[in-house]
Curated annotation (Swiss-Prot):
Reactions mediated catalytically: a fatty acyl-[ACP] + phosphate = an acyl phosphate + holo-[ACP]
Family membership noted in the UniProt record: Belongs to the PlsX family.
Function: Catalyzes the reversible formation of acyl-phosphate (acyl-PO(4)) from acyl-[acyl-carrier-protein] (acyl-ACP). This enzyme utilizes acyl-ACP as fatty acyl donor, but not acyl-CoA.
Protein name according to UniProt: Phosphate acyltransferase
Gene3D superfamilies per UniProt: Isopropylmalate Dehydrogenase (3.40.718.10)
UniProt organism field: Brevibacillus brevis (strain 47 / JCM 6285 / NBRC 100599)
One GO cellular component term: cytoplasm
Pfam families, per database record: FA_synthesis (PF02504)
Pathway linked to the protein: Lipid metabolism; phospholipid metabolism
Assembly, per entry: Homodimer. Probably interacts with PlsY.
Cellular compartment(s): Cytoplasm
């Protein structure tokens, strides 16, 4: 199996991407990681004797975080991100990963990889940790600011299959993000999609309020990209604030420091559950080729886990399963 990595994408690239690739092949020697980007910058973080299952594909350009996505993808065709997506489209690799510009990755995915038959709009996923020791797969978290009811049903089908095949959730539950749990709650979109989700071949558990997401109210949470992105940023901000305040309190006095020492094992476990690096990358579902988005701040561990996620995606043939399900349920038809 061959996985392409945009070696120049992310806040800590190329060091994090290269070291993550080395960690991934150490854990699974059967895979080959293709590092795409500035060859010399990549080599600076590789051992003198480069492992046989690490390859370098030169790419002279880099799409920066503040680049306008569509313009950057069209003008920087030799960028590490675009080259990696093209490799996936041309079947030179089985999947690609980037921690770079999210908008550019989505644009490149649409322009080069293309949408799956029947999919109108791909959806970007994210993992939100919950109190059950699992994650809630949330989509869409920013690929499309607006969505139609039948498109949310497509998100639900794709997310449910991904949760089952890659995350290992047996018959995952699906929830609709809303302002209340009652069936009649919400705006026109959520009211319209509710009965469609009930009719679909899904383990639909109804509306889910934002406050219940981290309690594990469902395995797959469906929403439009605007609402999903707001939820994701709120969760990230809350987690960051909590850890910052805990650190401040635990270091404010000798007694607090002693208490922190006693609580340290539990705090470490809690932080690990909340750490995005544990979950690696999340997919852009609905594209013909597997495209995985890693967090922009990904470190070595996060990149390694993103490669692991991509490997599972390919092994479980998720795209083919999604395509068959869409054809079976004719969910690609507009309503």
């Amino acid at each position: 199996m061959r996985i392409a990595v945009d070696a120049m994408g992310g806040d800590h690239a190329p060091k994090s991407t290269v070291l993550g690739a080395l960690a991934a092949i150490k854990e699974n020697p059967a895979i080959t990681v293709v590092l795409v980007g500035d060859e010399q910058a990549i080599r600076n973080h590789l051992p003198q004797d480069i492992p046989a299952n690490i390859e370098i594909v030169p790419a002279a350009e880099v799409i920066l975080p503040d680049d306008e996505p569509v313009r950057a993808v069209r003008r920087k065709k030799n960028s590490s991100l675009v080259v990696a997506v093209e490799m996936a489209r041309e079947k030179k690799v089985d999947a690609m990963i980037s921690a770079g510009n999210t908008g550019a990755l989505m644009t490149a995915g649409l322009l080069y990889a293309g949408r799956m038959d029947g999919i109108e709009r791909p959806a970007l996923c994210a993992y939100i940790p919950n109190s059950k020791g699992r994650v809630t797969l949330t989509l869409d978290v920013g690929a499309n600011m607006d969505a139609k009811p039948h498109q949310l049903v497509q998100y639900a089908v794709m997310g449910s299959l991904y949760a089952e095949k890659v995350l290992g959730f047996e018959r995952p539950t699906v929830g609709l993000l809303n302002v209340g749990t009652e069936e009649g709650k919400g705006n026109e979109l959520t009211k319209a999609v509710f009965p469609l989700l009930q009719e679909a071949d899904l383990n639909f558990v109804g509306n889910v309020e934002a406050r219940d997401v981290m309690q594990g109210a469902c395995d797959v949470l469906v929403c439009d990209g605007f609402v999903g992105n707001v939820l994701l940023k709120a969760v990230e901000g809350a987690a960051s604030t909590i850890f910052s305040q805990l650190k401040q309190e635990f270091t404010s006095s000798l007694i607090n420091k002693l208490g922190a020492a006693i609580l340290k094992p539990g705090l470490v476990r809690f932080k690990k559950k909340m750490d995005y690096a544990e979950y690696g990358g999340a997919p852009l579902l609905g594209l013909k080729s597997p495209v995985i988005k890693a967090h922009g701040s990904s470190n070595e561990r996060a990149m390694k886990n993103a490669i692991v996620s991509a490997t599972r995606f390919v092994q479980q043939d998720v795209n083919e399963v999604i395509q068959q399900s869409l054809q079976k349920n004719t969910l690609g038809e507009s309503e």
